[in-house]
């Protein structure tokens, strides 16, 4: 009797209905989980991107701790949450958290814009929405007439009170600048940041926060040991006499096949080149092209910073 009442279990329509209902339930559950986790994933991605950015600028060490430039070197630091400022630490500082990173970012990082003339401006000046403008990270920096720059302000009380418009108008409070870098590796797009000192020429550091390169080979562009090779390099190639023509000289950083010291010695070109990664020539070529193409629109701005800091004077950007 029971077997007769369940004869439909072997019917094609029942099997199809069962699969449909199961798929519908599973799909609904997955969609719900994705919806719930989406804000968390977005926050995690933003934290990682900002963390990598500040690592390039040396504000955060490779072991995820704040540091501050003092006495001619980078020293361990702690973020004072009450004063909202970095202070030199006499002991091992704690790990950077989401809260401390967000607070530092809000107080000491200004997202600005620059045009083809090297003029600085804020998003408010152009009545642009920051989130909307940055919502397409896959677009080239050359797709816009305005280009993004992240400005790191001096670690003091007066700087953190400055608005983006005030910083853009008189950028003497800027201690370092971070530029977005985008290019193509062996397997696809690569995205990163390049941090420069306020002279617009000397590299503080670099990072790559998104790529699809081969683990153990091209993926080593994210290796801190390799990234440290960029520190102190110059993005403007100096002439054989040591002089730099910011308006005309080659702008970028070259990742060469082999050793810089062996191939270039102490020539000016050595100051704008780093050792390549063994077995990742195509990725390294992509990194070289990424620097050249991404930095090109920023030449007027970098030249402005070079002139601004060589004169040591405070004057309006516009």
Swiss-Prot record:
The modification FMN phosphoryl threonine is found at residue 281. Composed of six subunits; NqrA, NqrB, NqrC, NqrD, NqrE and NqrF. It comes from the Bacteria. NQR complex catalyzes the reduction of ubiquinone-1 to ubiquinol by two successive reactions, coupled with the transport of Na(+) ions from the cytoplasm to the periplasm. NqrA to NqrE are probably involved in the second step, the conversion of ubisemiquinone to ubiquinol. It is found in: Cell inner membrane. The chain crosses the membrane at residues 13-33. Its EC number is 7.2.1.1. Coiled coil: none annotated. One of its GO terms (cellular component) is plasma membrane. GO terms for molecular function: FMN binding; oxidoreductase activity, acting on NAD(P)H, quinone or similar compound as acceptor. Keywords: Cell inner membrane, Cell membrane, Flavoprotein, FMN, Ion transport, Membrane, NAD, Phosphoprotein, Sodium, Sodium transport, Translocase, Transmembrane, Transmembrane helix, Transport, Ubiquinone. It holds the Pfam family FMN_bind. This is Na(+)-translocating NADH-quinone reductase subunit C. It is an enzyme of class 7 (translocase). Its main location: membrane. Its cofactor is FMN. Belongs to the NqrC family. The keyword Metal-binding does not apply. It catalyses: a ubiquinone + n Na(+)(in) + NADH + H(+) = a ubiquinol + n Na(+)(out) + NAD(+).
């Amino acid at each position: 009797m029971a077997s007769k009442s369940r004869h439909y279990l072997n019917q094609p329509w029942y099997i199809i209905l069962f699969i449909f209902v199961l798929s519908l339930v599973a799909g609904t559950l997955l969609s719900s989980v994705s919806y719930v986790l989406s804000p968390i994933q977005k926050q995690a991605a933003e934290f990682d991107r900002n963390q990598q950015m500040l690592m390039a600028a040396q504000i955060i060490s490779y072991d995820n701790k704040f540091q501050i430039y003092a006495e001619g070197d980078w020293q361990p630091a702690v973020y004072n949450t009450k004063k909202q400022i970095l202070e030199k630490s006499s002991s091992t500082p704690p790990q950077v958290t989401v809260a401390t990173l967000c607070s530092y970012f809000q107080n000491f990082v200004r997202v600005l814009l620059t045009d083809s003339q090297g003029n600085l401006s804020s998003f408010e000046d152009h009545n642009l929405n920051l989130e909307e403008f940055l919502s397409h990270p896959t677009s080239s920096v050359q797709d816009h007439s305005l280009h993004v720059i992240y400005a790191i302000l001096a670690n003091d009380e007066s700087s953190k009170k400055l608005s983006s418009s005030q910083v853009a108008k008189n950028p003497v409070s800027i201690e370092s600048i971070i530029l977005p870098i985008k290019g193509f590796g062996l397997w696809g797009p690569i995205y990163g940041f390049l941090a420069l000192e306020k002279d617009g020429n000397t590299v503080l550091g670099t990072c790559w926060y998104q790529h699809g390169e081969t683990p153990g080979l091209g993926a080593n562009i994210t290796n801190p040991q390799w990234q440290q090779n960029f520190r102190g390099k110059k993005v403007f190639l100096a002439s054989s006499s040591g002089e730099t023509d910011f308006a005309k000289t080659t702008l970028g950083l070259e990742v060469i096949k082999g050793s810089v010291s062996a191939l270039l010695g102490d020539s000016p070109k050595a100051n704008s080149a780093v050792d390549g990664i063994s077995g990742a020539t195509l990725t390294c070529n992509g990194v070289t092209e990424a620097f050249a193409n991404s930095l090109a629109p920023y030449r007027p701005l970098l030249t402005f910073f070079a002139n601004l800091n060589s004169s040591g004077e405070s004057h309006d950007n516009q």
